[in-house]
């Protein structure tokens, strides 16, 4: 699977995300209302990204990637500043415990890497137990060990725009839409 982060072309600051929970709602005559999540993947997200005044070389990397995926094939990506590098503050089988973090559902199904091992091991986050504890697919983290979480999710991009403000440079705007697939 293609990974957008491998391009090493970081979007401009000021990127934004839109999230709108999908909810089934039943309204009753007396003003009573019932709500339930619409499926298990009810938090879609769209990211508005820009790369302004980028050299043709960097811009062409982004354009080629988007053209290769053609809005059809999902790719891995995680937004800038969402990667976590920290040290575990507790230990338990198949758990990552870090009292300095605030884990959210955003980290479900992401990759955790044991940063201190000479041959780094990885595991997948299978459950967010609390704001400070994650359940992992393998027992790779011990108390005091450094780790990194790369919160990769799958996205598609079927809309992008390219302009050339001056020769040799390009502006690109794109919308990354999260897709829910294995």
What is each of the regions a protein language model found here?
Residues 74-143:
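Autoprocessing Asn-cyclization modules and mimics
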Residues 1-84, 145-182:
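Extracellular/virion structural assembly segments
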């Amino acid at each position: 699977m293609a990974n957008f982060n491998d391009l090493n072309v970081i979007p401009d600051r000021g990127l934004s995300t839109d999230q709108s929970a999908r909810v089934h709602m039943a309204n009753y005559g007396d003003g009573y209302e019932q709500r339930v999540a619409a499926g298990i993947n009810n938090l879609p997200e769209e990211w508005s990204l820009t790369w302004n005044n980028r050299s043709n070389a960097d811009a062409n990397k982004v354009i080629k990637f988007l053209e290769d995926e053609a809005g059809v094939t999902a790719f891995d990506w995680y937004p800038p500043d969402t990667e976590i590098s920290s040290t575990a503050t507790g230990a338990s089988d198949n758990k990552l415990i870090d009292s300095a973090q605030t884990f959210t559902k955003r980290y479900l199904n992401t990759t955790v890497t044991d940063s201190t091992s000479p041959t780094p091991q990885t595991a997948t986050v299978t459950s967010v137990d609390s704001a400070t504890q994650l359940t992992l697919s393998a027992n790779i983290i011990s108390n005091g060990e450094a780790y990194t979480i790369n919160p990769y999710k799958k996205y598609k991009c079927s809309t992008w725009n390219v302009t050339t403000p001056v020769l040799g440079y390009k502006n690109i705007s794109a919308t990354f839409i999260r897709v829910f697939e294995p």
